[in-house]
């Protein structure tokens, strides 16, 4: 399984460039979107060249999702744990954003390796924030417990007004994704890809990876979920996560893989579309010589 990078490459490069040229005092004001769902805004003024403001707008949550003060539950604690005193959370955030972080670049670690690691973590703010509730649940799984008030089906946002679902238990966490796509070609390609994905994992005998299944209809874990949340046109994918999948350093990898699963599938669908188009162009080219 190809893993998408957990950090924003553009944000990391911008941070590195800023740190290396901090005395030049160049003003910055950039907006961009990644994964088609997370919007970023960075600001640096000439008046305060050491202060880097990073604002993040998250996907609009569905009605089933738990947001606290505009953020997924556990996000504030996750931000403080990840960045410590080097980052200040502005309250309220900039208009139109869920979160604004104030970073004093003159106070970040002086050691080159530590500084780079810190900037990579800042550039991974999407993972830190959106992955926070998933991390809380999976950390409890690692200790074979269930997080307080989480002994029921939990909805987590991963796309605008779309959720994936977790059913936490002491010995496992079942994760279910209703897969939706807008384009009719994407639906066909995604359905085919997901069936092949599940079958390949089964036949390869990947005993160390989470068990995975796909179905046209909602699995029993989603009983009682609203009809809107179950409107999946590419089926449902389920993973069963056991404590061994979240032990030690495996936790970060599992959190990121689950947080970006839909983006991972979308990436492969788009790649297949490109290959199909290139194949059609090649076929037409060959036909022109007949």
Predicted regions: what is each one?
Residues 24, 31, 88, 153-155, ...:
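Residue-level detector of beta-strand structural context in well-folded domains
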Residues 66-90, 104-130, 196, 200-201, ...:
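Ampiphathic alpha-helical segments that act as solvent-exposed interaction surfaces
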Residues 61-96, 102, 132-160, 170-240:
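Short, internal acidic amphipathic alpha-helical interface segments
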Residues 273-290:
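Short, highly charged C-terminal tails/helix-capping segments
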Residues 235-251:
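Low-complexity, intrinsically disordered regions in eukaryotic regulatory proteins
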Residues 1-73, 98-150:
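Short Lys/Arg-enriched alpha/beta "domain-start" segment
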Residues 44-47, 91, 165-172:
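Amphipathic N-proximal alpha-helical interface segments
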């Amino acid at each position: 399984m190809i893993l998408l990078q957990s950090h924003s490459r553009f944000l990391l490069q911008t941070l590195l460039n800023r740190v290396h040229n901090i005395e030049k005092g160049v003003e910055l004001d950039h907006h961009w979107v990644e994964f088609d769902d997370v919007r970023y805004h960075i600001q640096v003024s000439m008046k305060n060249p050491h202060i880097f403001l990073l604002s993040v707008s998250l996907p609009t949550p569905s009605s089933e999702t738990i947001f606290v003060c505009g953020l997924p539950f556990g996000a504030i604690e996750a931000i403080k744990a990840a960045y410590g005193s080097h980052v200040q959370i502005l309250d309220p955030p900039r208009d139109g954003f869920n979160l604004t972080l104030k970073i004093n670049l003159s106070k970040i670690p002086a050691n080159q390796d530590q500084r780079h690691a810190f900037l990579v973590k800042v550039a991974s703010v999407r993972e830190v924030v959106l992955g926070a509730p998933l991390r809380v649940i999976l950390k409890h799984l690692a200790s074979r417990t269930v997080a307080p008030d989480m002994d029921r089906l939990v909805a987590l946002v991963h796309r605008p007004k779309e959720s994936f679902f977790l059913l936490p238990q002491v010995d496992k966490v079942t994760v279910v994704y209703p897969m939706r796509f807008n384009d009719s070609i994407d639906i066909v390609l995604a359905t085919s890809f997901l069936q092949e994905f599940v079958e390949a994992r089964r036949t390869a005998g990947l005993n160390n990876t989470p068990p995975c299944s796909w179905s046209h209809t909602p699995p029993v874990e989603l009983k009682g979920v609203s009809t809107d949340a179950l409107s999946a046109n590419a089926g449902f994918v389920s993973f069963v996560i056991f404590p061994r999948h979240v032990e030690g350093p495996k936790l970060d990898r599992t959190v990121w893989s689950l947080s970006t699963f839909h983006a991972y599938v979308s990436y492969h669908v788009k790649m297949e579309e490109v290959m199909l188009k290139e194949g059609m162009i090649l076929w037409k080219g060959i036909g022109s010589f007949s």
